[in-house]
Amino acid sequence: MPIEIISILIAVFPTIYFLFFFHSKDKSKKNSIHKIFPIFFFGMFMIIPVFLIETIIDNIIKEFYFNIYIYSFIASFIIAGFCEEGAKFIIVKKFVYDNPHFNSIMDGIIYTIAASLGFACIENVGYTLSMGSNVGYIRAFTAVPLHVCASGMMGYYIGKAKTQNHPKMENYYLKNGFIRAVMIHGTYDFLLFLSAGDPGYSDLSILIFPILIISFTLLYKKVNEY
C-alpha cells in the first residue's frame, strides 16, 4: 500500500472514531449518523476559508515584529482559537441550530463535535502528508482530542442556549460556549507555540496533556448527564 494512503488513513481514522464514539453516547438515538455526516463535511470544507483568513492575519501581525510571547498569544487565541472555533460555531448556527429537531443539549454537543472533527480531519491529512505518519500518530492523541474538547464544550452551551425561552439567556449561553472553546483551544496552542519558539519554555508543551485530560473528563461527564 502506498505510504500516502497509509498516512491518509492514519490522519482520518481518529476523527471517524471520535465521531462514532460520541454518536453512540446519544441516549435519544434521534440523530442518525446520516444526519451528522453533512455537518462533518461542512467542517472539512470550512478549513479552506479559515486557512486563508489565518494566513492573512498571520502575515499582517508578522509585520509588527512582536516578541515571541505576544506573537504566541495572538497566534493561539486569535488566529487559531477565534478563527477555528468561530468557523465551527457558524456551521452549527447556520445549518442545524434553527432546525426544530435540534432541541437538546446533546444535539449541541454531537453536531458541534461533528463540525470540529471534519475540520480536524482535513487538518490532520495536511500535516500527516507534509510531515509524515509519525505526526499523524501524535495528533491522534493531541490535536484531535483538542478539537473535540474545545468544540464539545462549546456544543454543550449551544445546546443549552437552544433550550432557553428568553433571548437574553440564549445569547448568554452562545457567547459563553464560544469563549470557553476559544480559551481551551488558545491555551493549548499557546503552550505549544511558546515551547517551540523559546527553548527556555520547551517543557511547557507537557502541560497540554493535563488540559486535554481535564477538558475531556468534563466533557464526558456532561455527555453522560444527557
Regions found by a protein language model. Give the residues of each.
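Hydrophobic alpha-helical segments at protein termini of multi-pass membrane proteins
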Residues: 1-226
